[in-house]
Regions:
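Acidic donor-binding loop of glycosyltransferase active sites
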Residues: 129-144, 151-152
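Short glycine-/small-residue-rich Rossmann-like dinucleotide-binding loops
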Residues: 25, 66, 97, 139-140, ...
Length: 182
């Protein structure tokens, strides 16, 4: 199970499985034959340089909407960033999903906020290395990549996810002081 909350299929299959593997320690009930394996993360993400932002340059803000794009992030962030004094405003790279690309670019333009808006980011290791702060959903693999890259984050879980697994994923980092759960 890749999430902090066991999904329906894995919950059903766990009854007949000889061993249960979990990406987040404690997903399966204690006493079950479980192995905390973690989730797979590419080596280049583990090799992300240590964060060294000292305030002498604009903050680098990476916004990740996931593969489908998170419409609330696409709409709210440009308007929120517009309220920041332009001299203090971060540099923004926003991954918004293919279907939201034009709308997200338009939202930044209307807000008067400069941003590099992309449908997809192929080099996630490079994106994490560039970022000082990440705002994103809380899918299991994204949360694990953030932990591996050592990047602080504001996590905005998908509100209608089955079993609210994204909130549990986000809480895993937030409870350890590695993220803020929104």
């Amino acid at each position: 199970e890749q999430n902090a909350v066991v999904g329906t299929a894995n919950r059903l299959l766990a009854r007949i499985a000889k061993r249960r593997c979990e990406g987040f320690t404690g997903s399966f009930a204690e006493g079950s034959d479980r192995r905390s394996t973690g989730n797979p993360v590419r080596d280049d993400i583990f090799a992300t340089p240590v964060l060294s932002w000292d305030g002498s340059r604009p903050m680098h803000l990476l916004v990740l909407g996931g593969s489908l794009g998170a419409m609330p992030l696409n709409k709210l962030l440009p308007a929120a960033l517009a309220k920041i004094d332009p001299a203090q405003r971060p540099q923004v790279v926003h991954q918004c999903g293919k279907q939201h690309l034009l709308l997200a670019r338009e939202a930044y333009e209307q807000a008067g906020v400069r941003a590099e808006v992309e449908a997809f980011i192929a080099d996630m290791a490079g994106a994490y290395a560039w970022a000082d702060l990440v705002i994103c959903r809380a899918g299991a693999l994204t949360v694990c990549e953030l932990a591996a890259a050592g990047r602080p984050s504001l996590l905005v879980p998908l509100p209608h996810a089955i079993d609210d697994h994204q909130t549990a994923n986000a809480r895993y980092l937030a409870d350890r002081g590695a993220a803020v759960l929104m």
